[in-house]
């Protein structure tokens, strides 16, 4: 099995466990990892019985080792990387791996929750914290959650258009909030947000709610409201073209 890379082995394992389980695995991977595995999977033409048997045997052995030793995964990974790459390179790579693993995983939890449950979870937080969370969600999920807030809270979507500048000041509070709500997950600083994000989310709301939000934004900042409307119009045109 020496000719198989780690990616090859992962692809074989994913193709073995079935579509539903493979999809669940993908939910826990970064976009880059999903792209790498998907590209490799698309190039698979044939898997021999020996390759399949070897991969499953290796996976079983690794799984049993972790279960039997109750091993600390981070410590184990660090030891392996140090032996393979040396102390300095291992430390740098491990930092990147753990940062990628932890990035926005708490936010991903909200993406898969029922909108009502997610809305109930965050509705009592500061509007800026709620807005910061919403711009990291899938647009449809964010719109559904917004629709469940009262009118006054929905209007605070105007914060979204400035979040990329406010993210640093809100980050500490946001991390603390999510630590309590979602079992200690972390949020990596991001430049997500802006007029486009606001427009995409508002576009997915019901017409009456959409108009109310735009009206509230216009009262606060007419120029900003017009920018959002222009972006919404552009977004709708792109959808029509598709």
From Swiss-Prot:
Organism of provenance: Shigella boydii
UniProt key word Membrane: yes
One GO biological process term: chemotaxis
Compartments in which it is found: Cell inner membrane; Bacterial flagellum basal body
A Pfam cross-reference name: FliG_M
Protein's name according to its UniProt entry: Flagellar motor switch protein FliG
Coiled-coil residue spans: none
One example GO MF annotation: cytoskeletal motor activity
């Amino acid at each position: 099995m020496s000719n198989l890379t780690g990616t090859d082995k992962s692809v074989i394992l994913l193709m073995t466990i079935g579509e539903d389980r493979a999809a669940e695995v993908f939910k826990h991977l970064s976009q880059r990892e999903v792209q790498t595995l998907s590209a490799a999977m698309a190039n698979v033409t044939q898997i021999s019985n020996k390759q399949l048997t070897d991969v499953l045997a290796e996976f079983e052995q690794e799984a049993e080792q972790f279960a039997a030793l109750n091993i600390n995964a981070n410590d184990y990974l660090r030891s392996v990387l140090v032996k393979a790459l040396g102390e300095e390179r291992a430390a740098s790579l491990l930092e990147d791996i753990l940062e990628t693993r932890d990035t926005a995983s708490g936010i991903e939890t909200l993406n898969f929750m029922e909108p009502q449950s997610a809305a109930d979870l965050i509705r009592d937080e500061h509007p800026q914290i709620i807005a910061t969370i919403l711009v990291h969600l899938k647009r449809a999920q964010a719109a559904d959650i917004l629709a469940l807030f009262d009118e006054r809270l929905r209007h605070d979507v105007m914060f979204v258009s400035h979040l990329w500048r406010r993210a640093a000041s809100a980050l500490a509070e946001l991390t603390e909030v999510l630590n309590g709500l979602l079992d200690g997950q972390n949020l990596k600083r991001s430049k997500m947000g802006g007029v486009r994000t606001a427009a995409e989310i508002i576009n997915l709301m019901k017409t009456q709610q959409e108009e109310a939000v735009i009206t509230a934004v216009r009262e606060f900042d007419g120029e900003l409201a017009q920018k959002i409307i222009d972006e919404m119009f552009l977004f709708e045109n792109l959808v029509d073209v598709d």
